């Protein structure tokens, strides 16, 4: 079973939980270039391709990094412009943010951008109409709907496998690929395959659950470049955010290497090329 390997190309200070004002970003040390290059070298080592959801701000600051991702044969998607939460934006603000990121990425890559992932999975129930906007502007694959609730985002009860959304009675051709979870009940799903959850759980649990998932559907692993850099700056914040942001950063690289050696991975477009998907009213 081919699983999707995805990277959210953003810097440590873009994280919504840290809540660092955008006006301060330029005064902070960036780690996105060396960390992303490290991931690219790692993927070359294991001969695997991935989908890189690139934040417009990161692309604007490091256009050569985006070119290098393309040069090495990986798939490019948009992660928005400035890592603003979708549910905190009006439709006009969202469209402006989204189109700005698309313009930058298409100018750098010379390619049409067909994939999108919202910052922090932040498309909420009252913002589902942005999926129609994405489709109208050329997006074929979206990965923004998190099938479990957190204080920051998420939608309980939505499909856990790739699906075609039905929004306000309209069947979309866009395919939604949610982050991989193990569904325990209709209203409870167990995340394990990316970000903090990948760092939190022992590798044995991650591997066991992904194997179970692969009996019925493809999984998706997601990672941020800063997660393989245990030396990122420590921002002063409350204990919970500090725990989520910095817990077991030193474990990420080894876990990722084990996953790449044990499972088959590819970019989202390749994974979904032959995947049958269902319609689902969300």
Model-derived segments and spans:
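Conserved, mostly hydrophobic/aromatic
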Residues: 8, 43, 52, 79, ...
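C-terminal domain-boundary segment and adjacent tail
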Residues: 45-46, 200-282
